[in-house]
């Protein structure tokens, strides 16, 4: 009888080309996504060596990190960013890779456009020179970020050298309360295991609450696997995944689709498969979450208080949290709902999809952004923007006082014109709250789209559960 295997084991075994005695493996890569920041050196390496891209049809290129989200008819204000964008256009043309430029309505954040185009498929291996490649694991794909030298290796060989990770599972059972979302689930998991808790593992998400999520919700969860230290995140594919993908430009068609679904139906962990580590959460007990510090593990209920580092026994950890409090300009014991905000950012590869914009618009409709808050909505792709405008969401945001922007990574990271000023405080639907992540000395609090929307109106954090009841 065959040994029970996990979903990760199955995908790994299906793509294993070679394994050396020391555990070093050569893995076949099905899909490769590239953007303007981590690809220029890789393409130049190919050019210098006189190599071609091995399988150009398996690579998709898009600009996202550096593109301005305002008027794109004007020159990029940052010369280095403009150079990187121009380099990607040249490299895509020279090496025969499909490319979505900043004027293409299919352009957007790389981890939004992959599933949107049907480039992301269950059971595939997917890499990108970007840490949030784990997003694609929502479809049952083994997806993770790689370095620039590895980008060159994949372009040249369609393979990757690596060692197999261990198996970890997060089981989230129960039903989410009103106002609690996928973003709160993943922040709760990271709060439970810490930012190093998943190190050395591929993390599969399972349980009633995960199965109940939409594909957008599953993408939010898998997106932040890296914030929990995991190499990748996975959710077993099901009818929701198939429905999302069917008919998209790059998915199989006709008999090929039916054949693919038959294979995808085998992609789930066996009942008695071994996991090296497992955690369990009850969704019914989860609150809306806000991060208070400079690490995604610094989580607290919106109904709670800024914690006191003095109560931490471990000296190194205590000093780290004291530094975080000082950087964030907060005092221990402060009510989370008393924290006032300067900026609100709704977007990113974590929460920039149509479902996220609908959730935010539902809260905002009929209200006005607080006078001391600057708020912006940045759709995750041109197609998300187009759909939102077809539904009239842009009008809701604009009427309320939000800026309605062009697609891109935007204020998730300080690599384009959308940045926080020093000591500005932002409620953000993105994935990282590190020091300087959104701008020099900027202060970031991670929240769900609905929480961000309510905070924009109130000017401070509010418990979305009370908001809905109001």
Swiss-Prot record:
Pfam families: Aconitase. [4Fe-4S] cluster binds at residues 349, 409, 412. It catalyses: (2R,3S)-3-isopropylmalate = (2S)-2-isopropylmalate. Transmembrane segments: none annotated. Pathway: Amino-acid biosynthesis; L-leucine biosynthesis; L-leucine from 3-methyl-2-oxobutanoate: step 2/4. Keywords: 4Fe-4S, Amino-acid biosynthesis, Branched-chain amino acid biosynthesis, Iron, Iron-sulfur, Leucine biosynthesis, Lyase, Metal-binding. Binds 1 [4Fe-4S] cluster per subunit. It comes from the Bacteria. The keyword Glycoprotein does not apply. SUPFAM superfamilies: Aconitase iron-sulfur domain. Heterodimer of LeuC and LeuD. This is 3-isopropylmalate dehydratase large subunit.
């Amino acid at each position: 009888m065959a040994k029970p295997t996990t979903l990760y084991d199955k995908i790994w075994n299906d793509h294993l080309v070679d394994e050396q005695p020391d555990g070093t493996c050569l893995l076949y890569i099905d899909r490769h996504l590239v953007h303007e920041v981590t690809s220029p050196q890789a393409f130049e390496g190919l050019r210098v060596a006189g190599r071609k891209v091995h399988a150009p049809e398996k690579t998709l290129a898009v600009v996202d990190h550096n593109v301005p989200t305002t008027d794109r008819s004007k020159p990029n204000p940052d010369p280095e960013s403009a150079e990187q964008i121009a380099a990607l256009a040249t490299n895509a043309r020279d090496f025969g890779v499909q490319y979505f430029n900043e004027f293409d309505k299919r352009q957007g954040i790389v981890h939004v456009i992959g599933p949107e185009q049907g480039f992301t498929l269950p059971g595939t291996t997917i890499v990108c020179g970007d840490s949030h490649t784990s997003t694609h694991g929502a479809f049952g794909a083994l997806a993770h970020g790689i370095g620039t030298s590895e980008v060159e290796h994949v372009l040249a060989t369609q393979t990757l050298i690596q060692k197999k990770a261990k198996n970890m599972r997060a089981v989230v059972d129960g039903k989410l309360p009103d106002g609690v979302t996928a973003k709160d689930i993943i922040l709760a998991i990271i709060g439970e295991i810490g930012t190093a808790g998943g190190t050395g593992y591929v993390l599969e998400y399972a349980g009633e609450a995960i199965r109940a999520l939409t594909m957008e919700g599953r993408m939010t969860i898998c997106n932040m696997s890296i914030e929990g230290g995991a190499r990748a995140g996975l959710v077993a594919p099901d009818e929701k995944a198939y429905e999302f993908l069917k008919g998209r430009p790059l998915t199989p068609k006709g008999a090929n689709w039916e054949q693919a679904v038959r294979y995808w139906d085998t992609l789930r962990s066996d009942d008695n498969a071994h996991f090296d580590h497992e955690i369990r959460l009850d969704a019914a007990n989860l609150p809306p979450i806000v991060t208070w510090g400079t690490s995604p593990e610094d989580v607290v209920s919106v109904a709670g208080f800024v914690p006191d580092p003095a109560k931490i026994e471990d000296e190194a950890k205590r000093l780290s949290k004291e530094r975080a409090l000082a950087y964030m300009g907060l005092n221990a014991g402060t009510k989370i709902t008393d924290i006032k905000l300067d900026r609100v950012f709704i977007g990113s590869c974590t929460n920039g999809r149509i479902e996220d914009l609908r959730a935010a618009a539902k809260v905002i409709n009929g209200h006005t952004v607080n006078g001391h808050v600057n708020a912006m909505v940045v759709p995750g792709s041109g197609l998300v923007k187009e759909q939102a405008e077809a539904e009239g969401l842009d009008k809701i945001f604009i009427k309320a006082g939000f800026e309605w922007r062009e697609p891109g990574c935007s204020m998730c990271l300080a690599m384009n014109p959308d940045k926080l000023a020093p000591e500005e405080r932002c409620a953000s639907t993105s994935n990282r709250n590190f020091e300087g992540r959104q701008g020099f000395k900027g202060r970031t609090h991670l929240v769900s789209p609905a929480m961000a929307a309510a905070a924009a109106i109130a000017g401070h954090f509010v418990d979305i559960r009370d908001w809905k009841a109001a």
